[in-house]
C-alpha cells in the first residue's frame, strides 16, 4: 500500500506543468510569437492562454519568476519528442573492442588483426590491442611493445593512441581510439 502511494506521488511530480498544474505565485509570460507580456499571477496568465485557445506551459522553472509560454501543448510535446528522437539517433555509444594476438604472430595473421581493428575504429569504437604471453615468453615484452607500436603506426591514418603500450600482468596492452574529425 505504501509503495502504491509512493508511485502515485512520483507520477504527479513528473507530469508537465501546464495550465492548472502551475504552482508558482507569479510567472513571467511569453506569448506564442515570443514577445514578453510581463509578470502575472498564474490564474490571469491561464485566462490569457484560454482566450487565445492555447495552453500555458512552464518552459523554465529554474529562473525567478518561472518562465511560462502560451502555446499549443500538443504541438510543443510533439516537437520535444521529435528533438529527443533526433538526439538519440545522433548519439553513438562507443564501446571497447579487443583484438588479441601473440608476439610471435605471422604476417598474414597480423594483417587480419589490422583489418579487424580498422573496421572497429571506422565504426566509431575504441580498440584494445592485447598481446598475451605464456610461461617464460614474458621476457620478450619488448618485442610485444614494438609490435603494438607497429600496429599504431599502421593504423595512424584513422586512429590515435589513447593509451601507449604497457605491461599489464601477463599481457601488453594498448588502447586506440578513432581520430577526431575537425
From Swiss-Prot:
The keyword Plastid applies. GO terms for molecular function: ribosome binding; translation initiation factor activity. InterPro entries: T_IF-3_C_sf, T_IF-3_N_sf, Translation_initiation_fac3_CS, Translation_initiation_fac_3, Translation_initiation_fac_3_C, Translation_initiation_fac_3_N. It holds the Pfam family IF3_N. The keyword Protein biosynthesis applies. GO terms for cellular component: chloroplast; cytosol; membrane. One of its GO terms (biological process) is ribosome disassembly. It is found in: Plastid, Chloroplast. Keywords: Chloroplast, Initiation factor, Plastid, Protein biosynthesis. PANTHER family: TRANSLATION INITIATION FACTOR IF-3 (PTHR10938), TRANSLATION INITIATION FACTOR IF-3, MITOCHONDRIAL (PTHR10938:SF0). IF-3 binds to the 30S ribosomal subunit and shifts the equilibrium between 70S ribosomes and their 50S and 30S subunits in favor of the free subunits, thus enhancing the availability of 30S subunits on which protein synthesis initiation begins. Belongs to the IF-3 family. Monomer. This is Translation initiation factor IF-3, chloroplastic. It comes from Pyropia yezoensis. The lineage of its organism: Eukaryota, Rhodophyta, Bangiophyceae, Bangiales, Bangiaceae. The gene is infC.
Amino acid at each position: 500500500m505504501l509503495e502504491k502511494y509512493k508511485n502515485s506521488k512520483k507520477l504527479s511530480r513528473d507530469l508537465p506543468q501546464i495550465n492548472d498544474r502551475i504552482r508558482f505565485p507569479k510567472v513571467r509570460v511569453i506569448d506564442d510569437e515570443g514577445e514578453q507580456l510581463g509578470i502575472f499571477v498564474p490564474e490571469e496568465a491561464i485566462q490569457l492562454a484560454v482566450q487565445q485557445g492555447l495552453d500555458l506551459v512552464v518552459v523554465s522553472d529554474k529562473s525567478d519568476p518561472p518562465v511560462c509560454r502560451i502555446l499549443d501543448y500538443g504541438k510543443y510535446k510533439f516537437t520535444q519528442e521529435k528533438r529527443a528522437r533526433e538526439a538519440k539517433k545522433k548519439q553513438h555509444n562507443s564501446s571497447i573492442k579487443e583484438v588479441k594476438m601473440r608476439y610471435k604472430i605471422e604476417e598474414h595473421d597480423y594483417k587480419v588483426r589490422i583489418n579487424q581493428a580498422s573496421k572497429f575504429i571506422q565504426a566509431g569504437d575504441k580498440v584494445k590491442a592485447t598481446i598475451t604471453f605464456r610461461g617464460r615468453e614474458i621476457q620478450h615484452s619488448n618485442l610485444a611493445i614494438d609490435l603494438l607500436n607497429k600496429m599504431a603506426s599502421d593504423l595512424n591514418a584513422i586512429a590515435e593512441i589513447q593509451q601507449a603500450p604497457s605491461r599489464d600482468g601477463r599481457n601488453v596492452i594498448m588502447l586506440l581510439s578513432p581520430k577526431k574529425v575537425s
